[in-house]
Amino acid sequence: MKQIELKILDPRIGKEFPLPEHATAGSAGMDLRACIDQALIIKPGETQLIPTGIAIHISDPGLAATILPRSGLGHKHGIVLGNLVGLIDSDYQGPLMVSCWNRSTESFRLEPGERLAQLVFLPVVQATFEIVDEFKSSERGEGGFGHSGKH
């Protein structure tokens, strides 16, 4: 297991609200919670930036973190990420914030400490480009946008 530095920015983290952790041995993500002082109403079509109460420093350029939506919030309530996926670079040290977008037709009430997104760590390959005049032939070639099937 890889250790990542975590700074607690909200004193409720680790006391009233649990630290992010993997819920099961097979969990890919760790829940991030809304570190707000009172319930927040997110109106239909509205986007709110929600603090999580933590900052992380990954430091390893071979890793990055993503902030992803929780499936139940999106499916049942229309609450998804305003930026679809949040990317946390290894050298970022600022607070983790979650952009919540209510794509439903009804207002959503977000409570303090409520789980609102998940943090997933991923390996990163930092690539460089080699300029070429032609590519080596591949099975797919230039086919894209539905080229390989019905959709």
UniProtKB/Swiss-Prot annotation:
Pathway: Pyrimidine metabolism; dUMP biosynthesis; dUMP from dCTP (dUTP route): step 2/2. One of its GO terms (biological process) is dUMP biosynthetic process. SUPFAM superfamilies: dUTPase-like. CDD domains: trimeric_dUTPase. InterPro entries: dUTPase, dUTPase-like, dUTPase-like_sf, dUTPase_trimeric. Signal peptide: none annotated. Substrate binds at R70, S71, G72, N83, L87, I88, D89, M97. Its cofactor is Mg(2+). It is an enzyme of class 3 (hydrolase). Keywords: Hydrolase, Magnesium, Metal-binding, Nucleotide metabolism. Its EC number is 3.6.1.23. NCBIfam families: dut, PRK00601.1. Belongs to the dUTPase family. This is Deoxyuridine 5'-triphosphate nucleotidohydrolase. It comes from Psychromonas ingrahamii (strain DSM 17664 / CCUG 51855 / 37).
